[in-house]
Amino acid sequence: MDALRKLSSLGRNQDKILDTASSSSYTEASVAEIPKASVETGGKDEASPSGLAPIKVRVSNDVGAEIEEKRGGDEESVGSGESFDSALERLAASSVTSFEPPSPVGSVGEQSQFAGGVSEDLEERGQEEYLYYDDYGDDGEVEKDGSEKDSTSSSSSSSSSECSSSASNTEDEMDISEYGASSERAMPLANPSGVTDEEEEDGKELKYNVERAVTAEENMPNGLKLGSEARGIASSSRGAELGNAFKDSREDHEVQEELTERSVKVAVENYDQEGEDADSTEIKKEFPRELTQSRTVIESPAYRFTSEPVDPALLELKSEKAQPNTQSFARIAEGESDADADADADDEDVESGDEHEDGYTEINIRQAAGKSESENESGNNPSLGPAGPSLISVLVRKTARRPASTAATDTQSSNAASSTQVAGTTDVNPSIEVNEVNETREKLQNIRVKFLRLVHRLGQSPQNVVVAQVLYRLGLAESLRGGSTRNHTRAFDFDRANAIAEEQEADNQEEELDFACTILVLGKTGVGKSATINSIFDEHKSVTNAYNPSTTNVYEVVGTMLGVKVRFVDTPGLLFSVADQRHNERIMGRVKKYIKKASPDIVLYFDRMDMQTREFGDVPLLRTITNVFGTAVWFNTIVVLTHASTAPPDGPNGTPMGYELFVAQRSHSVQQSIRQVAGDMRLQNPVSLVENHPACRANRNGQRVLPNGQIWKPHLMLLCFASKILAEANTLLKLQDTAAPGRPFGQRSRVPPLPFLLSSLLQSRAQLKLPDEQLDESDESDDDEEDEEEGDEYDDLPPFRSLSKEELEELSKDQRQEYAEELAVRERLFQKKQHREQLQRRKEMKKRATAMRKEGLSHPADEADDEAGQPAAVPVPMPDMALPPSFDSDNPTHRYRYLETANQWLVRPVLETHGWDHDAGYDGFNVEKMFVVKNKIPASISGQVTKDKKESQVNFEAAASLKHGEGKVTLTGFDVQTIGKDLAYTLRAETRFNNFKRNKTTAGVTATYLNDTIAAGVKLEDRILIGKRVKMVVNGGVLTGKGDKAFGGSLEATLRGKEYPLSRTLSTLGLSVMDWHGDLAIGGNLQSQFMVGKTMMVGRANLNNRGSGQVSIRASSSEQLQMVLIGIVPILRSLINCRFGFGGGQSSQ
């Protein structure tokens, strides 16, 4: 403890030796060369973040006095808010090395570099490893001149350091015995033989050197470089040059080990006193900047370095003939033997220079070291310029920072290390996904190479803004899809792809690339569409005329440009007048039909630079294009402005307008019109300028040059090729649904609404019947048949005489009640008798019709009319249509009255009951017709058209039934209905047959065509009657379309009353299930209706698996008029909500 107490007096002379760069050579001595001195330990040092008393080595008193003279007696503690650069300068100027033993409690969540050794993910790079100081935050600092750098490097190479660690882990995580060993290896300890125990066991010697790294890397004037000749943190590579300053001395290994153990105990005691939370919080605030090792960010141990004058008492610990310590700064981590084995393997890989996957992978130590998000943004994200994210600037910046030799060495060693790591991972966890990712990455790299070859052939630079954006988007798409792994750097991919592209172009300049582009040309008439095509191919391929439209049909122009097959679809010119939009629609219809054969990759919309329409005069034309092709056409469009050499007009002040301003105004005008018709104000279509006049200025190569100096043809083709390249990458990475063959402009075909179509498929439909079967029983008559009873209850009743009103007044109250009950019973029995007679009559008519069909006799239509009294011969008024309640005094029912005439076509108006127009609420009309085909097949046609101010709805249905045996009927139908803005065409067929007397089964198929997509499905339904009162219907089906599937089914159980349909008592329980995209929807509903006296009560309730439901009760009566008062409840509730604000959220729902 005496030695530790002496250390307390060593923490107050920190800044006395800051300017030792110009001092005597005594201040440049290394730790290993300092003579033995006494050691003092004391209390907590304010300069130490962890609160440990640092171990300080002092120089001679003469040197201390000389330094004190230069400093003027100023004393300041290191770590009191100064920057890492200042700490490094102080370290360079220091004549001593003052170091703290590593704390046994490293930082939480990760292993400290000094307490636990170097992180597992850091690779030992052998003799050429560098450790850089990454100071991105100080980009604005001006580097010192060469002399200052040399001085700094010289100072830092002989500098000493103090290492300390913060106490931030819990006491449970500490292992003092193990930590003692790690601390012994982490610090430069003397050994009588000059070799550590580890080096004796391994039979090798690992040496490291810490010195100032003065490189060309920006923002790194004070960086650190890890060499191969050092003995630890405190040793220096220039000790030999300054050896004459001090006498050779040897550190006593046992004394150093004892000091280490004692310091550890002090650290544990301080940690127990201060607590974990406060300590860790303080350390987080004092964390300095970062160290970057081969683009890998780790925590900087800057707070462990201090500079203090040497205490003479510490010289007693030094031997006069101490040898340099050769203890290596080894990596210490969990699984020590495994780490050493991995280090050996990595060293072998570095020596052999093997690369993994042609240099694609690289150890991503940034993630292993746990770099923060802000650091990732400052280190990885490319700069955002006016043209968007630029990858080239990032590549140039990173390449310029590292010397060529350093980059080559680091790349080789990183690839070798990553090869070892990836191989080990594959052996442990083999996965097919790795192979798929590598294959996808290779294909994407081929796309990059192809694009760069196109760029070289067009004479463009890889630093072009368009090229940079394409490469950036390819990298971004790859990372989003998972193709970019953590061992993969975009800079390396670009360099490799660019080198391959240049090599292939140098060997095969005339080779035809596996690349083709189809371009659709649209625009006004006379703007120069065909002339531009001729200019691109440098030959006359399209007919042009300066005075009349030359292109009257849609046709293809195919040619080869720079080894690339380019196909243009030339179209007739469009007229921009509102009255000519019909003409434009016909042309667009022909174009749409033509491009179904081959979908274009890009659309060029042409307009003239010198013809500007005001106040959105082109909107009608652009809207016609949008209505025909959809809004997706504008997301793949490049705006081309011809006659680009036109002189700019005069400005508002009478002076000629600048050319760039004129181009910007004209481009903005066209882009704004496109945004308006596309409905997306964020849309920004690229603009390309074109000049086809023979007198256009040209360069030495004969290429036409615009007034702004741009060669327009390579620029236009680069935009087209870039769009096609991005489309290929999208197809490869499957970022979104690709367009179906023949679908124009890469539009995403919408998936049909399968749940809606499946619900329509599962719906039961009634079978059509012949006219002579209309009076026959309904489809469910067999289920409703009742056995004839042996007697008629109504006939067995005694005689009954009705009482007059005067006689009822003479009866008492009880007698009047008994009379009403008797009258109700007789009325019910009479209705039952009539229902039974009706069923018997239907049976007889069914038997007679069956007998007549067997004998081959037909039932004349006029005979049926005679039996029915010929009701169709005389027009009769149809019942009045039920109108919604209104506060108008006039009842406009007469407006909707119509007659049923002898005509077979039935036409009726359609009233919108919820419309705003009460007096004239016609919303559409309905048409129906029933007829028979060849006297055997009943058929029906019905349609309805509705139209309001915004949209129209069309519904059409045609159906026919065909009997092919007893109890077997097939129903076919064709439906047309509006879904959104498209028409859905459905063809359906189903067959019903009787399995048993009380069981019917139905099987059906359907096919729907919607939006260029076909959805097909099947269904199966079974009906069964249990007794006379219970009926069950079970159905299920599946519908598929465009690779998507939907499953559904329903169960319905009906319980009828004993006297149904006379009593109208009915209860229904339903359950429906729908599965689409893995989303299971389950719903249940219950409905019951019954009579309470003369009041009909109807109750409904439904609930689904998402917890939403509804309950409703309805009562209708002609006697209990007081039920109208129930309507006051919602009115009072609304008034209360408005007055007091209660239930506002619920009422809004």
UniProtKB/Swiss-Prot annotation:
Which amino acid positions bind GTP, per UniProt?
526-531, 643, 691-692
Q: Where is the composition biased (Low complexity)?
A: 152-168
Q: Which cofactor does it need?
A: Mg(2+)
Domain (AIG1-type G) ranges: 514-743
Which residues lie within the region annotated Disordered?
A: 1-206, 219-292, 315-431, 769-800, 833-869
Q: Which domain of life does this protein belong to?
A: Eukaryota
Instruction: Kindly provide the name given to this protein in its UniProt entry.
Output: Translocase of chloroplast 126, chloroplastic
What's the source species for this entry?
Physcomitrium patens (Spreading-leaved earth moss)
In the UniProt record, the gene name given for this protein reads TOC126
